[in-house]
Amino acid sequence: NRWGFHADLTVGEKAALNASWASLPDFCDNRNALAVVDTSGSMYCYDNALPAAVALSLGLYFGERNTGIFHNHFIEFSSRPQLIEIKGKTFAERLEYLCTFNEVADTNVEAVFDLILDAAVRNNVPQEELPETLYLISDMEFNACVRNASVSNFASAKRRFAEHGYRLPQIVFWNVASRNSNQPVTKNEQGVALVSGCTPRLFSMVTSGDLSPYSVMMEVIESERYAKISA
């Protein structure tokens, strides 16, 4: 395959992947979460296309564990975002399907909010089936690829959600290509959690919703950078 990280697999390899994928625990603890995935070509311009592999896998992981109308859905970075249903029966088929999306665009976070709210209102979705967290996953920085994300835009979105009895989802912007291990998690003025890097511990911390200063500190202390000191 031209992307490299999901090359042609044997029947046995596909079966093993399907079994491994199906056995993954639910780190979301039954909370709905929706991935907004950067599918542009730059995600593949790294060794082993790791950012793309991580982003697409997270999109699939969160989508499969959602309940209600957001089950098996993700959103692609776009100026006109849409809820995209993930198709395919096996892990390999579903990952292949996600790889067919490759729009080169910033994401319009205001339009993402409107998309989710409109879907919820139209389908009478209860609060517990609304995504608690939106994961915006990219290889770029927040300010470089997110539009309509001012403090006033967030305040307006929060008000619109409240008018329909909903809470605005928490936003986690995840730069999966960043090598910044000094500040794996920060927050900007909009209250968006900015996550940098891609490690199993960071994944566990982010999906648990535990973005406390203590957890952030432990992520830094236990990073490879300080391994010799703590040994």
For every predicted segment, state its role:
Residues 1-231:
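Acidic, glycine-rich A-domain
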